Amino acid sequence: MHLTRLNIERVRNLKTVALHGLQPFNVFYGANGSGKTSILEAIHLLATGRSFRTHIPKNYIQYEADDAIVFAQSATEKIGMQKLASGEQLMKVNGDTVATQGQLAKLLPLQHIDPQSTDIIDHGAKPRRQLLDWLMFHVEPEFYFAWQYYSRALKQRNTLLKTRRNLSLADLEPWNKMLSDYGEILHSQRLSIVEQWNVYFQNDLSQLLPDLEIELEYSPGFHTEQGLMQDLLNQHQKDIERRYTEYGPHRADLRLKTPFGHADDVLSRGQKKLLIIALKLSQIAMLHASNKETVVLLDDLTAELDLTAQQRLIERLSQLGSQVFMTTLDHASVKKHLHDLSISYQLFSVESGQVSLAAS
């Protein structure tokens, strides 16, 4: 879904923003604190229901306002989100209220590329698992269904473990069965997708880090040779003592292995940034191969990447048919890249929360 129109109300210092005739590349420039990253934040809020900067709605809803609103339109769809300071939200697709955030996310596949961040590599398994599950959600039709049932069973099992001390195997049996059934499905789905993803990943890795050997290695979170049910049975007493479920797909990881060790231990900060970009580009490539258009948020492109890496990234996103919303302090460099690559774009100036069309 490529956006032709974007309206933002009361997100941080953006009181009212109305953008029309959006292009494949949309570049926002201005001083630090002007509000340009808040535009990306608003698009992220629409697609995911949350900000990439804070988990607390009142932190991004304008001071003394009760809500924030984001509306977007493509050639065929209209989607909107009202977020209240309480955290409640109202979502609409083509004028009809929808119940789940997933319905908006399916229409608006979105990737956020922050060249300054190395969280996916340095901050443990959770962000890597989330990265994998973003891909699963968009390319594996049955994933969301299986994940919902697995998550429900995990929540119920953990609640029992936290609230009751003398649990028998019989007490946990219904949840063990559901965890095992749906956990094995999730494992099979993830394993298949990681194998496919690795092919795309190697292509983008070779463009950004041609001298590095890195493999994606999926760690399932349980002992697959004996199966999840056996792990749950074997860990029965220890789970009671821990008060949570130790084994299962919720503990899975996506390991990034080099011939010299794991990426978090052996790569430089600069290499880690390019590795994360390669991971996300390869995911976008997988969606592109299945005729799905991705919206990409690219924050502060020129701050961390050299000119060659900047141009390679812009060119690759254009090849993949992505619609890009990017921020920069150095719009002259970005304009040159876009002109050199003959890419259609719009340039916007952002100053104190006011957004205006600038000369391209």
From Swiss-Prot:
Protein family: Belongs to the RecF family.
Record GO cellular component, one term: cytoplasm
Record-linked PANTHER family: DNA REPLICATION AND REPAIR PROTEIN RECF
Cited Gene3D superfamilies: P-loop containing nucleotide triphosphate hydrolases, RecF/RecN/SMC, N-terminal domain
Superkingdom of the organism of origin: Bacteria
Residue sites binding ATP per the record: G30, A31, N32, G33, S34, G35, K36, T37
Sorted UniProt keywords: ATP-binding, Cytoplasm, DNA damage, DNA repair, DNA replication, DNA-binding, Nucleotide-binding, SOS response
Biological process according to GO: DNA replication; DNA synthesis involved in DNA repair; double-strand break repair; SOS response
UniProt name for this protein: DNA replication and repair protein RecF
Cell compartment(s), UniProt: Cytoplasm
Originating gene: recF
Role played: The RecF protein is involved in DNA metabolism; it is required for DNA replication and normal SOS inducibility. RecF binds preferentially to single-stranded, linear DNA. It also seems to bind ATP.
HAMAP family xrefs: RecF (MF_00365)
Annotated transmembrane regions: none
GO terms of molecular function: ATP binding; single-stranded DNA binding
